[in-house]
Amino acid sequence: MSTYKTCFRFEDFYDWPPDPGLYCGSISSARFSRSSSGNRMLKVVYALQGVEPAYELVADYFVLEGESLSALAVFLARRRLVELYRACRIFPKEGDAINPAGLVGARLQIRVEHEEWEGQTRLRVVSYRPLAEPSGEEIPF
């Protein structure tokens, strides 16, 4: 007979998101969907490295079309999307189709900040950077 006792642990009661900052990660999914207002958007989910499992997946939304949107909101969302593509080393040109499947698996750096939402602190994606390319030079020690 086992004497092992399943019990609650400290981390079951306290939930701290990772510090704001830059994290390496990859894109685990990207797909078109509709916002709660019916606007067409792209939802991108990033898998962050080096964070607790509860915060490993972070979603980012790009609202690209909709009657209730301001021209500025659409412009800013599209500009952020171009920044994301470039951080993934994909360089779209005017007229190219937005292809979410082409983003899946891309590795990049994701900057996150804390945001209060419905009384809880959650992560919000604020920017992206490409991963540094290996220079091919050896580091002298």
Could you say what each language-model-derived stretch is?
Residues 1-141:
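Short beta-rich binding modules
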